[in-house]
Amino acid sequence: MTEVKLDFQKQGGLIPAIILDHTSKEVLMLAYLNEEAYQLTRTSGQMWYWSRSRQELWHKGATSGHYQTVKKITADCDLDTLLIEVDQLGAACHTGAKSCFFHPIWDEKDGKTD
């Protein structure tokens, strides 16, 4: 694994992570990692996040059984955002949907906005 110095301080100790399905490349969710969640993710191979609402570490799937197994982690050019590809077991969204992104707002085909 390549070691890089991620910039956790730029955004108050948290780094946003865009989570993609490894096979389909569908965006599943956006969540945040603090340094501890990042280290747990790297060492365990499963996704750990920092819950901003509960102010605690969150092991994705520990309650729901919808685990995310890490396949690839890439940092952006500023080292302050992550793109993480996972194998998703079950739904990624707490609503039970596969992806958290399911509210259409605008589509270039019809040029309409919500």
Swiss-Prot record:
Cofactor: Mg(2+); Zn(2+)
Signal peptide: none
Pathway per the UniProt entry: Amino-acid biosynthesis; L-histidine biosynthesis; L-histidine from 5-phospho-alpha-D-ribose 1-diphosphate: step 3/9
Primary residence: cytoplasm
Keywords: Amino-acid biosynthesis, Cytoplasm, Histidine biosynthesis, Hydrolase, Magnesium, Metal-binding, Zinc
Gene Ontology CC terms: cytoplasm
Catalysed reaction equations from the record: 1-(5-phospho-beta-D-ribosyl)-5'-AMP + H2O = 1-(5-phospho-beta-D-ribosyl)-5-[(5-phospho-beta-D-ribosylamino)methylideneamino]imidazole-4-carboxamide
UniProt-annotated binding residues for Mg(2+): 76, 78, 80
Family annotation (InterPro entries): PRA-CH, PRib_AMP_CycHydrolase_dom, PRib_AMP_CycHydrolase_sf
Enzyme class name: hydrolase
Gene3D superfamilies: Phosphoribosyl-AMP cyclohydrolase (3.10.20.810)
GO biological process, one term: L-histidine biosynthetic process
Record-linked Pfam families: PRA-CH
Enzyme Commission number(s) of this protein: 3.5.4.19
Co-factor binding comment: Binds 1 Mg(2+) ion per subunit.
Subcellular location: Cytoplasm
Binding site for Zn(2+): 77, 93, 100
Assembly, per entry: Homodimer.
Role: Catalyzes the hydrolysis of the adenine ring of phosphoribosyl-AMP.
Family affiliation: Belongs to the PRA-CH family.
Name used for this protein in its record: Phosphoribosyl-AMP cyclohydrolase
Species of provenance: Streptococcus sanguinis (strain SK36)
Gene (UniProt): hisI
